[in-house]
Amino acid sequence: EEIDGMCNMCFLPSTGISARIFAKWLELPTLNEINDLIETGFVQTTKRRTISLHPMIQEITLSETKPSVTRCHILLDSLQKICLMHGIEVDYYKKLFQTAGNIIELIEKDDIPKYLLFLENVFPYMDNYNYQKGMKEIIQELKNFLKPKDIGTDSDRALLLDFQATLEIKPEKAIKLEKDALAQIENITADNARLVSNLHANLGGLYRMNGHPDLAREHMEKSISLLDQFNLLHINDSIPQIANYAMFLTEQQEPERGISELQKLSGIIKEYHSDDCLDYAKVQETLGTIYLMTANLPQAKTHFKRAFKIYEKIWADEPEMIEAKYQEIQELYPQIGFCIGKNLSGLLTK
């Protein structure tokens, strides 16, 4: 038991991490096991209840226990679970990313498919926080592993190209990478439909941003029709895709179509999840934005209010998140030609 705990501790950030969080990652019911290790002197602890391994102990543990993907699967699964909880932010994300970085550097890769999946699940969460250092490490690691043709799947190769496109600054290069990613997948199946839909959405987004509305429309519509075809409209990925498509339709002077897509999505989220979750709020906020763009203030107000009611409930302990949202919407007003600015908070709270 203790050796297993030690073996996972090799990946802790050198600045340490909260004992409670670490115990949760390892699914330990209590802190007893960690406290025992602190008592033996193997694990260092500070006043703030953070734990870390002494570098010398770390070195010995690495060579003695050889932590591997198979052996440390609970830790890897826990980190992936956090990265896959859409819309849920954790305040220790830097420590999480440092731990992932140490895993990449130090773990024995004895189960390659499981390891590749770990990298692929962590990358989008790093992207949320624009954690470039970690994103670059993951891309490099995937490149190294996927060089031999017999390792990995078409989907792995498509994801690598998609990740590279995410970090690519030149639009034409990013577009080429997304097209190459799509070319990796010959047959669309239930297993890869979500990925292919995402790739079309990303490509559509790039075309939209670079002034190719016809191509943007083609790929955005393909992306949504795949979600529809494979009954995936209720999953988290569909939300940004449909929201972006609705905004695109509004830019193309078709706001009614955009609004009807979003209302359909609202219904689906309500049916599969609830009407007080973060995803529902995001859709309400997008509806508010479109009504703003079409100068329909009463409707805009209704939808923003609905969104904020949910944000204020979910982020009750994080007033700065709510404040940041207010700021974000406040900036929308002048951009869209309304200079209501300061009255916004008043407008929404009435």
For each predicted feature, which ranges?
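C-terminal boundary/linker of central alpha/beta nucleotide-binding cores
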Residues: E1-T65, C72-D77
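Conserved alpha-helical positions within TPR/SEL1-like repeat arrays
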Residues: E120-D127, S155-K170, R194-M209, M220, ...
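Short coil/turn linkers that connect adjacent helices within long alpha-helical scaffolds
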Residues: K109-D110, P148-G152, N187-D191, Q229-L233, ...
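Amphipathic alpha-helical segments of tetratricopeptide repeats
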Residues: I104-E105, Q140-K147, D180-N187, I224-Q229, ...
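Extended alpha-helical scaffolding segments used for macromolecular assembly and cargo binding
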Residues: E1, R71-F145, K149-G152, D156
